[in-house]
Amino acid sequence: MQQLVQQQRLVLNQRLVHGLCLLQLSRGDLKTEVLRAVQRNPLLEIRPSSARRTGKACYLSLGDRRERMRARDRFQQLLENQPDKQVDNIRAVLREQVFYQKHEAIVLDLACAFIQMLDDHGFFSISPAIFQNMCGSMPTALQEKIPQAIALIQRLEPQGCAVFNFKESLAVQARLRFERFSDPLYRCVINLLTHHSELLFCSDNMCDGRVSVHALTTQINSMGLCVQKVSSNDVKDILLLIKELHPFPGKCVSNAQRADTNMLLEPDVLITKTAHGFVTQINCTGIPTVVFRNDYCMHSKAAEKNHALKACMHDALSLVSMLSYRERTLLDIAKTIVHYQCGFFDHGPAKLTPLRMTDVAHRTGLSVSTVSRIVRDKWLQYGSQHFSLRYFFSPRVLSTEEYRDRSSLGQNYPSSPHSKVSVKYRISRLIQEVRTQRISLSDRRIAQLLGEQGIKCARRTVNKYRSELRTCSSS
C-alpha cells in the first residue's frame, strides 16, 4: 500500500544565507557591503540625494542667538553624559547568564567554577590532560554532573565556549545552530566541523589560506560526508554557513566593548518625543540608496538569452528586496522596544523593565534568532544619548526566595517588574546619597531599602551588582 507523506522543511540557498548575513551587519559593514555589491553588479546604482542633484550645499541653519545657545547646551550635555566605561569580559558575561538558568544548584556551581578557568577567547586555559585529572579527583556525585555543566556553558551566549580550541568551538556552534534543520547541507556542516576539520584547517591554528571549493567538493563526495552528492554551489553555501560561526567566541565580548569606547557613533534608529508620544525612525543618513537599473536591461540585446545578465538581475533584485526587508524588520523591532520601554524614555534607567528577545519575537511575529541578528551591533539615539539595542534586553531581578530555590525559576514565582539595569541604577543612587554623609551601607541594608521601594532583591544579588558597579561593600 502506498502512502503519501507531506514534509515541510527549510531548504538552504544562496539568497537565504546572504539575507541572514545582511541582517546582522553593523551600519559601517552594511555600507561597505552595499558599495561592494554595486561595484560587482552593473544592474545596481546608487541614487543620489536631492541635495546632490540640485547642487545645493547641506548645512545646519541656526536662526538666532537663542537657538545657537540651545545647540551649544545640547553639545555640552552630550559631552557630560558620556558614561564611565566598565569593560566586562567573557567570564563575567557567562557567569551572569548562569545565574538565571533552570538547573540544579550543583550544576550551576560547577558551571561557575568552569567559567573561571576560561581565557579571553572562551577556551579552557588548562590542557585537556590537566582538566581530566582535575575532574577525576572530584567526588563521584560531581563527576556525574560535569557533562551537564559544560553543555550548559556551551549553550550560553556567545555560544561555543568551554572548549579547548577553535575547532571544538566551531563544532559546538554548528551543532547548536544547525541540528534542528533537516537540510542535508546543515548535516554536512556539522559532520565536517566535528569529524573532518582537517579538510578546512591545516593546523590547530587558524588557516589564513582559502579553502579550494573544487577540492573540498571532491573530498566530500569521495568520503561520503553528505547523504547526497554536493555541487560547487552547495560547497559555497557550506563555507558561508561556517563563516557565520565565530572561531573565538570570547572576542565577541571584547569587540563589543571596544566598540562601546568610540566617542562618535552613527545610530541606526532615531527616537524623538512629541506631544502624541514617541516617534521611531530609521537613520538613513550615510547609507547608500540602491536602486535597480531597468534601462540597462531594456537597452541590452538578447537579455533573455544572456545567462550572466540574468544572474546579475536575480542578484540585484534580491539585494534590493533584502535591504528593504532589513529596514522594515529593524523598524518593527525598534518600535516594539519603545513600546515596552516607554517608561525608560520618560523617566530614565530606574524605569527600565525586564525584556526578553522572546517577548519582542512574539509581538513582531519573528523568530528569536532573527531578533538576535537584528539587534547585533545596532545603536539607538534618544536626545543626546546613544544606547545599544541590546541594552534594552535586561533580565529580571531574583527575590530572596528565588535565590534559595534557583531550580524553580519561572515556575513557582511571578515575574518581577524590575530589571537588572534599573536595580543597579537604584543601588548606585542609594550609595551616592549617603556618600556625602560618610556612611557605608551594607548589602543587607541596601536590600531592605530596595524592599521599601517595592523591590524584593536578595542580599547576594545586591553584592553582585555592587561588584559590577565597583563600589565597596560592607557586610
Curated annotation (Swiss-Prot):
It comes from the Bacteria. Keywords: DNA-binding, DNA-directed RNA polymerase, Nucleotidyltransferase, Sigma factor, Transcription, Transcription regulation, Transferase. Residues 356-375 bind DNA. InterPro entries: RNA_pol_sigma_54, RNA_pol_sigma_54_core-bd, RNA_pol_sigma_54_DNA-bd. GO terms for cellular component: DNA-directed RNA polymerase complex. A motif (RPON box) lies at residues 458-466. One of its GO terms (molecular function) is sigma factor activity. GO terms for biological process: DNA-templated transcription initiation. The keyword DNA-binding applies. PANTHER family: RNA POLYMERASE SIGMA-54 FACTOR. Sigma factors are initiation factors that promote the attachment of RNA polymerase to specific initiation sites and are then released. Belongs to the sigma-54 factor family. NCBIfam families: rpoN_sigma (TIGR02395). This is RNA polymerase sigma-54 factor.
